[in-house]
Every structure is written in structure tokens, then in C-alpha cells.
A protein has these predicted regions:
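Nucleotide-sugar donor phosphate/pyrophosphate-binding loop at the beta->alpha transition
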Residues: 110-119, 140, 157-176
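Nucleotide-activated donor-dependent transferases that construct or modify glycoconjugates
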Residues: 2-14, 23, 39-42
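Short N-terminal targeting/anchoring amphipathic segment
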Residues: 107, 119-136, 153
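Short amphipathic alpha-helix
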Residues: 17-28, 42-49
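N-terminal strand-loop element at the rim of the active site
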Residues: 33-104
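Active-site proximal beta-strand in glycosyltransferases
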Residues: 130-135, 141-160
Length: 197
């Protein structure tokens, strides 16, 4: 019987993580693994290049994974205020911290705001032998909090120190992953400088 692998992504837009994923997908043993790619949204110029052996599914409330400055207000109001008005209070607390902070504290508050929003997402259905958070920190948070898996691996495609990240928060999530894969020596160095263990 094949083992089940879930790869957590965001979209298949033309970007470094997506291109790297396609290369990674070429090396999966599909005789050993039943693979599902879980995306926030089933879109992107590279979507057609996903191997046919990979089943593609979308996350409920996936727009939360795609929050950015341009759409944050709309997405957060839709997922907080309209669904459950009481959820607005943590949002307001994090928003105030963002507004009144600068530098590292502001970056930390932005991560906490997003994490608070992600916590409202429905869990991923099914159980997996392996969950791979391939698109970075947001997918790692989702894989740890929302996916039932025996093992987890996180891929880092970004400089850990930019924007500043809250070490205590990230360490908590890294500890729940069996392995952290860095895609370059520079990324490995930036992670090691902040979290040497």
C-alpha cells in the first residue's frame, strides 16, 4: 500500500518556490507515494506543469494564505467580522500593535495577525504519512496546525532574518517538523544565526 504525502502550497504562479516544487516533484517515487498538492487557490501559469500523478486540492478559506497589504482588510473582515463578530477582538489587538509599532515589533505583530487569521481556517481532511510545507513559513504554520500527519518537513526559500521573525514563535513550529530544508547556504546561515540549535 502506498504512503500518503500532502504538499502544502499557495498557488502555482511563476515564482521560485513553484519552480523548485516542480523540480522536486520530478524526483518523487510515485510507486511508493500517493501525493496530494493542497493549494490555497488552484491558479497560476505553472499549474498545468504539475505531474499528472499528483492530485490537486484547494483549502477551504484559502484566501487567508494569500493575505497581503492590498487585500488584508477585505479578507480579514470577511473571515472575522462577518462569520463571527467576536473574532474581531484578536484582530483589533494585533492591528493596534502593527499601527503603533515599528521595526521588529511591527514585523512580529504582522506575523501574529496572520497566524491568528490562519487559526480560523478549517483543518485539512484526511491523515497523511508525510506533510511537506514547501512554500515557506505560512505553509509550515498550516501544516503544523491544520494537517494530521505522522511526519512534517518544512522547506525554507527565504532569508530567515528579513523581514524580522519572532524566534520563539518560529522555534515552536520548527520543533514540530522532523526536518527543515534550506534551499541555499545563505538561507541556512541566516537561520543558524538566529536559531543555532
Amino acid at each position: 500500500m502506498k504512503k500518503k504525502m500532502l504538499i502544502v502550497g499557495i498557488t502555482m504562479s511563476v515564482g521560485g518556490s513553484e519552480k523548485s516544487f516542480l523540480s522536486f516533484a520530478e524526483h518523487i517515487d510515485y510507486n511508493e507515494w500517493d501525493v496530494t498538492l493542497l493549494l490555497a487557490e488552484k491558479k497560476g501559469a505553472l499549474l498545468a506543469l504539475v505531474p499528472s500523478q499528483i492530485k490537486i486540492e484547494t483549502m477551504p478559506d484559502g484566501e487567508i494564505m494569500e493575505i497581503d497589504v492590498a487585500n488584508a482588510k477585505k479578507v480579514l473582515l470577511k473571515n472575522y467580522a462577518l462569520k463571527n463578530p467576536l473574532r474581531i477582538f484578536p484582530l483589533l489587538c494585533h492591528s493596534a500593535k502593527i499601527f503603533f509599532s515599528s521595526g521588529k515589533r511591527r514585523a512580529y505583530a504582522k506575523h501574529r495577525l496572520w497566524l491568528s487569521a490562519m487559526k480560523t481556517m478549517k483543518p485539512c481532511e484526511g491523515e497523511y504519512d508525510l506533510a511537506v510545507a514547501y512554500w515557506g513559513d505560512r505553509t509550515m504554520f498550516y501544516a503544523v496546525d491544520k494537517v494530521k500527519a505522522k511526519r512534517r518537513i518544512a522547506w525554507l526559500h527565504f532569508d530567515y532574518n528579513f523581514p524580522p521573525r519572532e524566534d520563539a514563535l518560529y522555534e515552536k513550529y520548527f520543533m514540530q517538523c522532523e526536518k527543515i530544508v534550506t534551499v541555499s547556504k545563505e538561507i541556512e546561515k541566516s537561520l543558524g544565526e538566529s536559531l543555532p540549535s
